[in-house]
């Protein structure tokens, strides 16, 4: 439902987006930045503008544009980076109202995922770029996208868990480029400063991957900026979460971490943070002797195990290489097929979504045009008809859904009923066969003989019945007379039925003619609108009827035009005679519909 009192700038912009072709939509959406910047920050007017932008689906248009290829968008990465800023500013501080569930569960996660995908695309373009100016521009656009993502996460903290669990974020974190890596590490540090508790809510595999990447950058990256940021991140995590500190201390994955950190060169930039981290990872109480024994035993076990594994691996090396190559090629083929399938599905989904939006827009425009064409007095009737049609459609779908649901619920009982009928039929057939066999093999007992007394009694009953009901006898002459009367009555009935049928057909024809005449009279225009051709529609095809009508018309005219002294002795019901010559002359010029003039 569109809000009342919509900002005219948003309204005109939405109309322009709806009417413009697809390639011009991104540039038109950039006008939202000027509207947002001209509105006072933190005011109720800004909230109202954001609500209008959301209600007119402009945020969804921005998401659709961000999911497209940058080469197809006018302005390229510059337009895309500005759209990310617009999208993040519109989503932060927005109150969706009734559509809150869709906004928080679908739109916001989709926006964060699109930002990460854009970051990966920019990372790829930055690595493939050869010119320094191009790399500087791409790095600037990447920084804008990360800032927009951080702004979005600052307004919606629940998205931090989705971002940290995303594979795209992990790929961004695993980059070898110093500049991109520094930006991503700074983004991660800012995210954890907002709310680091979401890091413990993610899956264990994702948490280990993030910690491994931070430790890798701390121990292997030559850049002091990245190493300093990684040290600060580990220090913040270890100080704020006891679980992560225990994991870094006791987990077998991070064994020897303290010794590696002690070997790091103490730079003046982050030596203090590094020393604090080493102090946190060193346990206050531990038994050095037992640890040394355990260490020696572990080294011995590892040596034997590694030797066994090495010998086993050397034996399987030729076949393992072939299997590895085969599995790598098959995995790569599957990945390519999966990527192509996902891309095709995404393109199809976007195409269908655009088609649905375009169809909805055309439907709304046609409805508005129809309302403009309809007379104001018929608008309420038109709306009522549309409501009835909509109600009928809803009822049809609801009844279909209800019947399908009832059928699914009744299917087990129907199956049981059919099975019971089948069993009953089989049992009845079996019992009938059994009875038939019994009758075939039953012994013959013979008929019971009648006694003399019983035979006399039955003969007396038959004689009494014959006496009470004597048969009627008719002579041949009486029979012929009765037959002649029946034939006469039958002939009379058939003749009367034919006459009645003709009379009924005549009555139906007269009723149809009367209905046609009434319909013509109802559709006849008023005297003010008549043009002179209308009387021809009321001429009869029957000459007697036309003559009678003409005679009545002339009688009325003659009576009206007669002087008053001729009307003194007349009664209201008296008829006036008309000469036949006047009637015949006029009839000669009378047009009879359906006939040709002589």
From Swiss-Prot:
Q: List UniProt keywords, sorted A-Z.
A: Calmodulin-binding, Cilium biogenesis/degradation, Coiled coil, Cytoplasm, Cytoskeleton, Repeat
SMART domains attached to this UniProt entry: IQ
Location (main, coarse): cytoplasm
Q: Please give the residue ranges the record annotates as the region Interaction with BBS1, BBS2, BBS4, BBS7, BBS8 and BBS9.
A: 530-598
Localization in the cell = Cytoplasm, Cytoskeleton, Microtubule organizing center, Centrosome
Residues annotated as domain IQ: 294-317, 318-338, 387-416, 417-437
Checking Gene3D superfamilies in the record gives: 1.20.5.190
Annotated region described as Interaction with BBS1, BBS8 and BBS9, given as residue ranges = 1-157
Q: Name one GO biological process term.
A: cilium assembly
Q: InterPro entries, from UniProt?
A: ARM-type_fold (IPR016024), IQ_motif_EF-hand-BS (IPR000048), IQCB1 (IPR028765), P-loop_NTPase (IPR027417)
CDD domains registered for this protein in UniProt: IQCD
One Gene Ontology MF term: protein-macromolecule adaptor activity
Residues folding into a coiled coil are: 336-362
- A single Gene Ontology CC term: centrosome
Residue segments, region Interaction with CEP290, BBS1, BBS2, BBS4, BBS5, BBS7, BBS8 and BBS9: 287-598
Tissue-specificity statement: Localized to the outer segment and connecting cilia of photoreceptor cells.
Q: What is known of its domains?
A: The IQ domains mediate the interaction with calmodulin.
Q: What quaternary arrangement does the UniProt entry report?
A: Interacts with calmodulin. Interacts with CEP290/NPHP6; IQCB1/NPHP5 and CEP290/NPHP6; are proposed to form a functional NPHP5-6 module localized to the centrosome. Interacts with ATXN10. Interacts with NPHP1, INVS, NPHP4 and RPGRIP1L; these interactions likely require additional interactors. Associates with the BBSome complex; interacts with BBS1, BBS2, BBS4, BBS5, BBS7, BBS8 and BBS9.
PANTHER family linked: IQ CALMODULIN-BINDING MOTIF CONTAINING PROTEIN 1, IQ CALMODULIN-BINDING MOTIF-CONTAINING PROTEIN 1
User: What does this protein's UniProt record list under function?
Assistant: Involved in ciliogenesis. The function in an early step in cilia formation depends on its association with CEP290/NPHP6. Involved in regulation of the BBSome complex integrity, specifically for presence of BBS2 and BBS5 in the complex, and in ciliary targeting of selected BBSome cargos. May play a role in controlling entry of the BBSome complex to cilia possibly implicating CEP290/NPHP6.
Task: State what protein this is by name.
Answer: IQ calmodulin-binding motif-containing protein 1
This chain's source organism reads Mus musculus (Mouse)
């Amino acid at each position: 439902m569109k809000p009342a009192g919509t900002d005219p700038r948003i309204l005109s912009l939405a109309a322009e987006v709806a009417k413009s072709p697809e390639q011009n939509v991104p540039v038109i959406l950039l006008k939202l930045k000027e509207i947002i910047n001209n509105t006072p920050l933190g005011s109720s007017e800004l909230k109202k503008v954001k609500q209008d932008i959301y209600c007119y689906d402009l945020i969804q248009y921005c998401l659709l544009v961000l999911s497209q290829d940058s080469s197809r968008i006018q302005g390229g990465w510059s337009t895309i980076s500005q759209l990310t800023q617009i999208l993040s500013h519109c989503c932060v501080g927005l109150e969706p109202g009734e559509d809150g569930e869709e906004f928080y569960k679908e739109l916001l996660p989709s926006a964060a995922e699109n930002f990460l995908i854009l970051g990966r695309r920019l990372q790829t373009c930055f690595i493939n770029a050869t010119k320094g100016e191009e790399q500087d521009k791409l790095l600037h656009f990447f920084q804008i996208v990360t800032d927009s993502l951080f702004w979005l996460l600052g307004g919606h903290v629940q998205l931090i868990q989705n971002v940290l669990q995303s594979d795209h974020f992990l790929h961004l974190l695993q980059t070898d480029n110093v500049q991109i890596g520094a930006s991503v590490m700074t983004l991660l540090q800012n995210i954890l400063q907002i709310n680091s508790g979401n890091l413990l809510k993610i899956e264990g595999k994702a948490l280990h991957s993030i910690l491994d990447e931070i430790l890798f950058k701390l121990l292997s990256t030559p850049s002091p900026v990245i190493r300093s940021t990684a040290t600060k991140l580990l220090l913040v995590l270890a100080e704020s979460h006891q679980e992560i500190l225990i994991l870094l201390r006791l987990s077998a994955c991070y064994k020897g971490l303290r010794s590696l950190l002690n070997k790091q060169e103490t730079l003046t930039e982050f030596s203090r943070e590094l020393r604090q981290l080493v102090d946190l990872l060193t346990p206050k109480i531990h038994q050095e002797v037992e640890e040394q024994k355990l260490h020696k035993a572990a080294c011995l076990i590892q040596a034997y195990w590694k030797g066994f594994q090495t010998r086993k691996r050397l034996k399987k090396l030729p076949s393992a290489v072939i299997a590895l190559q085969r599995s790598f090629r098959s995995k790569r083929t599957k990945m390519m097929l999966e990527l192509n399938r996902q891309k095709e599905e995404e393109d199809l989904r976007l195409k269908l979504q655009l088609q649905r939006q375009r169809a909805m827009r055309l439907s709304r425009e046609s409805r508005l045009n129809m309302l403009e064409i309809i007379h104001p007095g018929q608008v309420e009737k038109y709306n009522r008809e549309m409501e009835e049609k909509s109600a009928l459609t809803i009822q049809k779908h609801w009844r279909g859904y209800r019947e399908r649901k009832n059928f699914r619920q009744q299917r087990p009982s129907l199956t049981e009923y059919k099975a019971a009928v089948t069993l009953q039929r089989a049992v009845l057939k079996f019992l009938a066969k059994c009875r038939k066999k019994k009758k075939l093999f039953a012994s013959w007992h013979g008929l019971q003989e009648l006694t003399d007394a019983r035979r006399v009694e039955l003969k007396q009953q038959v004689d009494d019945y014959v006496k009470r009901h004597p048969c009627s006898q008719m002579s041949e002459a009486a029979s012929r007379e009765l037959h002649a009367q029946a034939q006469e009555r039958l002939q009379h009935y058939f003749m009367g039925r034919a006459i009645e049928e003709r009379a009924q057909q005549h009555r139906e024809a007269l009723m149809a003619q009367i209905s046609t005449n009434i319909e013509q009279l109802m559709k006849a225009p008023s005297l003010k609108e008549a043009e002179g051709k209308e009387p021809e529609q009321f001429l009869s095809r029957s000459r007697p009827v036309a003559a009678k009508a003409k005679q009545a018309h002339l009688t009325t005219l003659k009576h009206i035009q007669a002087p008053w002294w001729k009307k003194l002795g007349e009664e209201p019901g008296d008829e006036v005679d008309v000469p036949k010559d006047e009637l015949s002359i006029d009839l000669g010029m009378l047009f009879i519909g359906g006939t040709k003039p002589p």
